[in-house]
């Protein structure tokens, strides 16, 4: 049993359990809690039972097939984690028993630890309850905050970053709508659709206020300005799937649909038909306006897709709030709408204020190539918080 390893005093006597996110600090082993290891062992036994059932000619319905696939991924991750922990244990024993091999063992440990922690994080994510919209595509809404025209330019930069990120991962995307400022140098509002299943789970922690510190091109005295932009990340709900739990059929008295002529720049851009659509959802007060397409039908479909996404996210947040309020101790959350990240151009630094992760490569992040470094750090931090809550619930 791998859980017994965690009880060996010499092995873990000096191991720091605190999670480290700053990339400049030394890497240390972050062992999973023994209760989580026991949980993984339960999944191993459950998978064996399903395999025995299959070997005996038992029938597998759709639910059993889904469960088999889920358990297989967990057990595979657990097996890899256990193997790497055993390697780490052997190297630690070499350090204690054979001083002549100390330098080589230390080098091997330094090479092993990043992979071991990454494997542990992957296993932890599989052991935690999944996000209700983990498999959904995503819709990103971006709007400038404080900072005037520089905030609008920064909003355009963030939009480009997410498009670059989607291209880097070869995800399909399209702009649902984009409204530029008068000069065309910045964005007043942009709505980006990333049509990749699971992209919501990957991007959900991008929601919040992003802050930039840099010298604007129009600044003659070289002073650094601070501007902000707000990002909203929504799950894209199915439009036709009857099995989707959040698929809605709106009652006539819930929705008001207004159609009108689209506004434009004049000339060929003026739409002479009533193609623009505005939806008003009375129960929530949400209003969606859409005029990007020349077809009223397409504008209406896009507007309803955004409305479904906003309502689904609203219901999820309300449910989480009720669950938090039901606990005796208030649980910290990463769903805050305040400043989440700073992009400091003079220092070439990006810092996520929720988990404390810092990366010195703004260009790599804005190109989409290193955004995963920031996202993964926040994801690991969130998983740690969820694991703590899960352990509290298990011991209650």
From Swiss-Prot:
The keyword Cytoplasm does not apply. SMART domains: PCRF. Keywords: Methylation, Mitochondrion, Protein biosynthesis, Transit peptide. Gene3D superfamilies: 3.30.160.20, 3.30.70.1660, 6.10.140.1950. Residues 317-340 are annotated as: Disordered. Methylation of glutamine in the GGQ triplet is conserved from bacteria to mammals. The modification N5-methylglutamine is found at residue 268. SUPFAM superfamilies: Release factor (SSF75620). GO terms for cellular component: mitochondrion. PROSITE patterns: RF_PROK_I. GO terms for biological process: mitochondrial translation. InterPro entries: PCRF (IPR005139), Pep_chain_release_fac_I (IPR000352), Pep_chain_release_fac_I_sf (IPR045853), Prokaryotic/Mito_RF (IPR050057). GO terms for molecular function: translation release factor activity. It is found in: Mitochondrion. Mitochondrial peptide chain release factor that directs the termination of translation in response to the peptide chain termination codons UAA and UAG. PANTHER family: LD18447P. Belongs to the prokaryotic/mitochondrial release factor family. This is Peptide chain release factor 1, mitochondrial. It comes from Kluyveromyces lactis (strain ATCC 8585 / CBS 2359 / DSM 70799 / NBRC 1267 / NRRL Y-1140 / WM37) (Yeast).
């Amino acid at each position: 049993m791998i859980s017994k390893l965690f009880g060996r005093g010499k092995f873990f006597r000096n191991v720091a359990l605190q999670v480290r996110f700053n990339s400049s600090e030394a890497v240390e082993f972050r062992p999973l809690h023994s209760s989580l290891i026991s949980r993984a062992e339960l999944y191993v036994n459950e998978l064996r039972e399903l395999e025995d059932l299959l070997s005996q000619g038992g029938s597998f319905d759709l639910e059993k097939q889904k469960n088999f696939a889920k358990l297989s991924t967990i057990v595979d991750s657990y097996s890899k984690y256990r193997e790497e922990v055993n390697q780490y244990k052997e190297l630690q024993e070499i350090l204690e028993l054979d001083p002549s091999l100390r330098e080589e063992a230390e080098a091997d440990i330094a090479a092993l630890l990043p992979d071991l922690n990454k494997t542990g994080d992957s296993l932890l994510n599989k052991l935690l309850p999944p996000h209700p919209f983990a498999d959904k595509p995503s819709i990103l809404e971006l709007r400038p905050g404080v900072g005037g025209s520089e905030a609008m330019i920064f909003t355009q930069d963030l939009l480009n970053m997410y498009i670059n990120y989607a291209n880097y991962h070869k995800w399909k995307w399209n702009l649902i709508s984009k409204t530029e400022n008068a000069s065309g140098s910045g964005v007043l509002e942009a709505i980006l659709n990333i049509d990749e299943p699971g992209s919501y789970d990957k991007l959900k922690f991008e929601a919040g206020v992003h802050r930039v510190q840099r010298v604007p091109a129009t600044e003659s005295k070289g002073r650094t300005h601070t501007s902000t932009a707000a990002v909203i990340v929504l799950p894209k709900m199915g439009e036709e799937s009857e099995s989707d739990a959040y698929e809605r059929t709106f009652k006539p008295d819930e929705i008001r649909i207004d159609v009108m002529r689209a506004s434009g720049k004049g000339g060929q851009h003026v739409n002479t038909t009533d193609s623009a659509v505005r939806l008003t959802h009375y129960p929530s007060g949400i209003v969606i306006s859409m005029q990007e397409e020349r077809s009223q039908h397409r504008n209406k479909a896009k507007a309803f897709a955004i409305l479904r996404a906003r309502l689904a996210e609203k219901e999820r947040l309300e449910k989480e709030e009720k669950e938090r309020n039901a606990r005796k101790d208030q649980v910290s959350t990463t769903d805050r709408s305040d400043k989440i990240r700073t992009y400091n151009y003079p220092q070439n630094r990006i810092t996520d204020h929720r988990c404390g992760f810092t990366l010195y490569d703004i260009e790599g992040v804005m190109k989409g190539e290193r955004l995963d470094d920031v996202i993964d750090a926040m994801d690991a931090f969130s998983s740690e918080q969820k694991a703590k809550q899960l352990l509290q619930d298990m011991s209650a």
